[in-house]
Each structure stands twice: as structure tokens, then as C-alpha cells.
């Protein structure tokens, strides 16, 4: 592929280590009939090796210069290019009738977290996602309760899927080299949550509220949300810190509680703020 100048606003760091590319592809265990979509193909470091293994590949790319280069070097029969912002793309449209979609990508670090939640909202169409991300984010995605990396991101992602740390990727595997280490993670959406929440929006807000006082007992952060009697009813020690509770614990607390009246009012449709809390 011809030379392309990286664009800082797209968070572009292009992978160029073929050994790591091959290792990432091997972890997929590609099978005949798989429908795979690559997010952010860039210069094709993953794209071309994937096309050696597959008869056809979908890619989602926003950079028009890269799209032009990909179109010059590939036919639509082999490579379908979707010119779109991945954060707005409807991945369900790519799912075949008989099998779920598979997703892969070296994701721009500046959009990785919102993009993962965008994909999880469409998880009914996806069997698995394999991503190269900032190592710190991968450690948070795959963390366990009681560890320093366990937090809002860990809980909400693991509510929706199984998260597995696959392998480390050094900065020199990219051009230009990022200032951080990277790693590869696999996310496998649950067919249904092992611990279903009655209201996922309430669960998300409760988890966010709990971690406003990460180093204190959870009773402090959830003082207006969960009563002492409710903690006792679900068998959770209110003296534990927020990072010591599991996904199941948070679901139990969410299912037995309601947000304080002022939080409900702030998110009611008739208020001026009516958009609610969309933070993750």
C-alpha cells in the first residue's frame, strides 16, 4: 500500500509487525463460512493477511485517503468497504442469516471504550470480538474483583460478556510508536447475562455512583441508594470497598434498590436536562 500520513485526530498508530499480526489471526480460529468485519483497517496490516485466510472481508473505515487506497488495491468481491464512523455504524446489517458476526480490529485508543459499548449494544448479532487496545484498558476489561484495575469498565463489560487477555504488544510494533503498551483482548458476549439486571440503566448508574468513593466503604458511596436493610437482605457486607464487589453483587444491589429521587428527577423526560447520563 502507498504511503499514508497518519492523522492525529483519528488516533492512528499503524501495526507493522507481521509476527504479531499472524498471532492475532491465529487466535481467531477462522472457519469456513465465518463473516468477519475489521474496524479501522488502516494501511491493511491485518486486512491483507486476513484476506489470505478468507474469501471475503468487511471493513469499516472513516479516513477517506485510506479508503481510496484500499479500493485501488482490492475488488468489491473480496473486500467490502463501509465508509463510516464505527461509533455510528449498525453492525447488525452485516450479520448473515445463519451465523453471528465476528469482529476484529486494532482500535484507535481515543474511541476504544465507547466503541466497545456501542458493539455490546448490538451483541445479539456478534459471536466474538478480538481487539488490540491500550494495555491499561485491556487490564481493566479483564480485571477481577479485589484488584486495582477492577472498576466501572470491568463490571459493565463483564456484565455483558466474557473478557480474556490474550497477549502483550510492545510500542515498537506500531508506526508511529504509541507512548503506551498495547495488548490483545477477546470479548465473547453472553447469550444472556449470568446475573440479569431488572434495569440495566439503573445498574450502570449505581456502579458509577459506587465508584465515586472508591477507597471508602460502599455504604458511603451508595448512602442514598441502598439502605442498611437492603445490604443485609442480599447478604453483602456494606463495609467492603466498591472494588471488592463482584458483578453479581452489583446486580443484586441494583435489583433491590432504586435511585434517589433527585437522580430520577434529573433524568425524567420533562426536565430541561432530559438526556440522562450517558457516561461510561
Curated annotation (Swiss-Prot):
Keyword field: Cytoplasm, Methyltransferase, RNA-binding, rRNA processing, S-adenosyl-L-methionine, Transferase
Family, similarity comment: Belongs to the class I-like SAM-binding methyltransferase superfamily. rRNA adenine N(6)-methyltransferase family. RsmA subfamily.
Source species of the chain: Alcanivorax borkumensis (strain ATCC 700651 / DSM 11573 / NCIMB 13689 / SK2)
Function: Specifically dimethylates two adjacent adenosines (A1518 and A1519) in the loop of a conserved hairpin near the 3'-end of 16S rRNA in the 30S particle. May play a critical role in biogenesis of 30S subunits.
Binding site for S-adenosyl-L-methionine: 13, 15, 40, 61, 85, 106
Name of the protein this chain belongs to: Ribosomal RNA small subunit methyltransferase A
EC numbers on record: 2.1.1.182
Gene3D superfamilies in the record: Ribosomal RNA adenine dimethylase-like, domain 2, Vaccinia Virus protein VP39
